[in-house]
From Swiss-Prot:
Keyword Transport part of the UniProt annotation: yes
Keywords annotated in UniProt: Coiled coil, Exocytosis, Protein transport, Transport
Subunit and partners: The exocyst complex is composed of sec3/exoc1, sec5/exoc2, sec6/exoc3, sec8/exoc4, sec10/exoc5, sec15/exoc6, exo70/exoc7 and exo84/exoc8.
Compositional bias per record (Low complexity), positions renumbered to this chain: 36-52, 62-86, 143-245
Region listing for Disordered, in residue ranges: 1-87, 122-246
Protein name as it appears in the record: Exocyst complex component 5
GO term, biological process aspect, one: Golgi to plasma membrane transport
Its job: Component of the exocyst complex involved in the docking of exocytic vesicles with fusion sites on the plasma membrane.
Length: 978
């Protein structure tokens, strides 16, 4: 509802009314503000106070729109006339009230009466215009500015407005379809006597000369306002005419207010007022719309205001009680805290004194304990020394008495009882130490000998017990003996004896199993230049299984486990692994290639399948890589000799075979080969890479760079110098045309040139592979030796330069051959080809043949040459061809007209062919060739213009004269104009 949403503005209006000249709230509801001690009650107090002030100021009704006009007279007997118009909105319904008041003051008496009250209700829900107007006009009554006592508190704030007098008692008013007008005329006369200032409602005329007719009024209290509303309801007259029935509520149900309504952050003034007035609004809804009656709302708001005031008083009283309780609690808390602080300080002093006493006693106790422990240690040492001396004296005396009594000796139980052998070992170790200290005393010589004898026999007895326990897998007994021997003399013999007695090192069946596996060559697979041998995987898997089992036993038995594991690993490499590798390699002793591959595979397999897994055991004191190198040292020492011998035999046999085959080729026979034999070149590359890979593994560190250089130089020698150079020279000789031969097969020569191009292409490809090999397989492994690195680089580029020089020679020879073929193709050119009279727009037969030949040369070069080599070659071909054409056309007479057009047709075709070469030099040369045709096309007087304006300026005068003389209409006088 819109009037409920304006509750905040009504609170501000109430604050303004409390200023001087406005309406002050009743003094009975004013309570001093206190600082709340309870957050719950404080939160409730704020909304209740706001609602109380709002209801006091406006009764819950929104700010009305009031138009008032006052007519005052300076003479006391004159009456005051006031017309008040008030507009109120409830939701979408608008209420408009118009009231005519008149009053007259005389002395201490005040006469006031209400003339006419018009109520207009406007609602969008009304379907038809309904209006009533009822009025009672008193012609003797005069307007007054004083309000009627029956008016609501809202209506007391009126200003004067013009009145509308009607002479008829019953007047019907027709309004808009959404407006209902009800005019109620009441006449009320109120007499107020102002005798004392304490009167509840006092109207006193002003004595000011400027405004004597105005009367100052004071707001009534809440009780007086309630009484006025009740009187107004009782005095309400029956309307004279009412077209729409209005039903008033029988009883206003007061809403009980509690503090729970105002709890929480979601409380809203608007929602509260809407809930408060919803029942009244529903009751006033008739069949034809809403009929507003303000009296029930005023009564409801007054009751609510009283309840809110009472609730506010209760909350304030509760706040005061809580504040007092908090103050009392704070006082008690501080008093108890002071008492506890004093008690704590007293207790702290007692504990401090107690701690000091405990520290003093503890220090003394520790001192006494140290002294007692020192005395006890000295006592134990003295007793031990005394016991050792007694045992030593016993051994010394027993030895002497045995000699005197014929070998009859009597010893202590510790020397004779076998169950105390471990205790005896501890005693003998101490006796041996004492014997060393007193060896210079001659009286204890016999005791020292007896101690040594007992020590030897004792160690042998413990070793025998250990071996018997190992045979029956009694790990507890083994551990007891090993621990005793470790404390007796370190236990090295015990660990060594255990390793020697392992089944894998002396059992005949184990030896035969390893030997049979090494001789089983069916498990070896050869894949190209690589081998896959599963024998090593089977063998090393079995070893790792045995090592894992023995490690478990060693951890459970021996104290010094690292030493025992080191002995086990060393024995494995020195005996079992070495024997297996020797058996495998002995089968390949007659085949150098397989021997080298097997050695390399065995080395890598041993490292990968055995050394690397054993690294995970973390055995201290054993260098596994050194053990690996010790096994393969005998093969590494003579590796490079075997490698070079194998490579030389392989390279030599292939090169000799290929060279012998090429020697049988005829000069002009057809060739099916495409350059170098790819099988041979790839064999060189693959075998060299394999050899370099083997050298990384099988070469000793100090000679690795030299071995790589040896292998690389060997490959360069056979691949470049002995094979590639030989093949290149062989194919360079083929395209040469003998001068004595008058009939040469052009197709055969073209094929030989094509073969040369393919050889050049093959050489370029193999050179690229060798350069990649150098970067990947050679250079990274020789960087530690700058001398070897420099030697390898120089040798590589020397061989490449030699090949390039030879290739350049071959390409120059091929160009010469091509030009010779072009000249040979131009020979059939007829002398009258350019003296014809009929023009058919076709090239000559010779021109077509030459173009076809040059195009074939260009295609061969494009397929087989690459990069700058191709561009330089075709550019040279184009320039040489243009030179041949220049000399060729110097020999022919050119007819003017049709003959010149025929010449231009041939020259245009030559020029178009030259565009493929994509060379500016070639384009300029053929442009010059085409310009020659203009000398035959223009008139003689234009020779100078043609020569100076085109490419002919680059041609010598002698050549120009030659071409001019070839005109069919040549006259010598033309030469004077040049």
């Amino acid at each position: 509802m819109s009037w409920a949403r304006n509750i905040q503005s009504r609170i501000q209006q109430q604050q303004q009314l409390q200023k001087p000249g406005g309406l002050a709230p009743p003094s009975g509801n004013e309570t001093p503000q206190k600082q709340p001690s309870s957050p719950t009650l404080s939160a409730l107090s704020s909304p209740i106070t706001s609602l109380t002030n709002a209801l006091r100021g406006s009764g819950g009704i929104s700010q009305p729109t009031t138009n008032t006009t006052s007519l005052t007279s300076t003479s006391p007997p004159s009456p005051t006339i006031s017309t008040t118009t008030t507009q109120v909105k409830v939701g979408q319904t608008s209420f408009t009230t118009s009231t005519n008041l008149q009053a007259a003051a005389s002395g201490n008496n005040l006469q006031a009466s209400i003339q006419t009250t018009n109520i207009t209700v406007t609602s969008p829900s009304m379907a038809s215009p309904i209006g009533t107007s009822t009025g009672i006009q008193n012609p003797n009554a005069k307007p007054s500015s004083l309000p009627s006592p029956s008016q609501s508190p809202m209506q007391t704030r009126n200003t004067s407005a013009p009145t509308n007098n009607n002479n008829n008692n019953n007047t019907a008013t027709t309004t808009t379809p959404t407006t209902t007008t009800t005019t109620t005329t009441t006449t009320t006369t109120t007499t107020t006597t102002t005798t004392t200032p304490s009167t509840s409602t006092t109207t006193t005329p002003t004595t000011s000369s400027s405004n004597l007719g105005q009367i100052q009024q004071q707001p009534p209290t809440l009780q007086q306002q309630q009484q006025q509303i009740q009187q107004q309801q009782q005095q309400q007259p029956t309307p004279i005419k009412q077209t729409t029935p209005y039903i008033f509520p029988n009883k206003i149900q007061p809403k009980s207010l509690t503090t729970d309504m105002f709890r929480g952050s979601e409380f809203s003034h608007v929602t509260f007022v809407e809930d408060l007035t919803r029942k009244l609004v529903n009751d006033q809804m008739g069949a034809d719309g809403l009929h507003f009656e303000p009296a029930p709302f005023n009564q409801l708001f007054l009751n609510t205001q009283l309840q809110l005031s009472q609730l506010e008083s209760n909350i304030d009283r509760r706040l005061d009680d809580l504040a007092e309780e908090c103050n009392d609690f704070s006082y008690d808390y501080k008093r108890k805290l002071q008492d506890l602080t004093g008690s704590y300080q007293e207790c702290f002093q007692h504990f401090k004194k107690l701690e000091k006493g405990v520290n003093t006693i503890g220090t003394k106790a520790v001192h006494f304990g140290d002294e007692l422990d020192s005395v006890n240690q000295q006592k134990v040492k003295a007793q031990g020394a005394l016991s050792l001396i007694n045992y030593l004296l016993e051994l010394n005396s027993v030895g002497a008495s045995s000699e005197e009594n014929g070998g009859i000796t009597k010893r202590s139980d510790i020397f004779t009882n076998s169950d105390r052998i471990h205790e005896l070992a501890h005693l003998v170790k101490k006796l041996s130490s004492v014997s060393e200290d007193i060896k210079e005393i001659s009286g204890f010589k016999q005791g020292k000998l007896e101690t040594e004898s007992i020590s030897n026999s004792l160690e042998n007895d413990l070793l025998n017990q250990f071996e018997r326990a190992a045979e029956r897998n009694d790990y507890d007994k083994m551990k007891q003996c090993a621990t005793t021997l470790h404390g007796f003399n370190g236990g090295e013999r015990c660990r060594s004896r255990y390793i020697q007695k392992l089944k894998m090192f002396f059992d005949i069946d184990s030896f035969r199993k390893d030997e049979n596996l090494a001789n089983n060559i069916t498990k070896r697979l050869i894949r190209g230049n690589n081998i896959v041998d599963t024998r090593f995987e089977i063998f090393y898997t079995d070893i790792l299984k045995d090592v894992s089992h023995e490690q478990m036993v060693i951890q459970n038995v021996f104290v010094n486990q690292t030493s025992a594991m080191a002995m086990l690993i060393i024995r494995l490499f020195e005996q079992r692994v070495r024997l297996f590798i020797e058996n495998v390699l002995s089968l390949e002793s007659n085949n150098v290639s397989m021997f080298l591959q097997t050695v390399h595979y065995a080395f890598n397999s041993t490292k990968k399948l055995l050394v690397d897994p054993l690294q995970s055991y973390g055995i201290v004191g054993v260098d596994l890589n050194q053990l690996l190198n010790s096994i393969f040292y005998q093969y590494q020492e003579g590796y490079i000799q075997k490698e070079t011998t194998y490579l030389v035999s392989l390279f030599q046999s292939n090169v000799v075979e290929e060279c012998e085959r090429l020697q049988t080729l005829d000069r002009y026979s057809m060739y099916l080969e495409d350059g170098l034999n790819p099988e041979i070149t790839q064999m060189f590359v693959q075998q060299t890479e394999n050899a370099l890979t083997r050298s990384y593994t099988l070469s000793l560190d100090n000679i690795l760079a030299d071995n790589i250089k040896t292998i690389f130089f060997l490959m360069l020698e056979y691949l470049f110098e002995k094979y590639s150079m030989f093949v290149l020279n062989k194919y360079i000789e083929l395209p040469m045309i003998p001068s004595s031969s008058s009939n040469v097969d052009t197709k055969s020569i073209q094929d030989s040139i094509s073969q040369l191009f393919r050889v050049v292409l093959s050489i370029n490809q193999i050179v690229g592979q060798i350069q990649s090999m150098f970067q990947v397989f050679v250079l990274p492994h020789i960087q530690t030796s700058m001398i070897v690195q420099s030697q390898c680089s120089d040798q590589l580029y020397f061989n490449i330069s030699s090949l390039e020089n030879t290739i350049n020679t071959g390409l120059e020879n091929s160009l010469t051959t091509m030009i010779q073929l072009i000249e040979k193709t131009l020979l059939p050119q007829g002398r009258n080809d350019y003296l014809i009279d009929d023009y058919d727009n076709s090239v000559t037969d010779t021109c077509a043949s030459v173009i076809k030949l040059i195009q074939s040369f260009y295609d061969m070069a494009k397929i087989n040459l690459q990069g700058k080599n191709f561009h330089i070659y075709v550019e040279e071909l184009g320039l040489k061809s243009q030179f041949v054409f220049i000399n060729h056309f110097k020999k022919f007479k050119i007819g003017q007209g049709i003959g010149t057009l025929k010449l231009m047709r041939d020259l245009t075709e030559y020029r178009n062919l030259s565009k493929q070469f994509k060379s500016q030099k070639v384009d300029d040369a053929f442009e010059l060739l085409f310009e020659i045709s203009k000398l035959h096309l223009v008139n003689p007087e234009n020779f100078k213009l043609v020569i100076e304006g085109g490419a002919l300026t680059r041609m010598s005068k002698q050549d120009l004269i030659i071409f001019i003389k070839q005109r069919s209409d040549f006259k010598s006088i033309w030469l004077d104009t040049l």
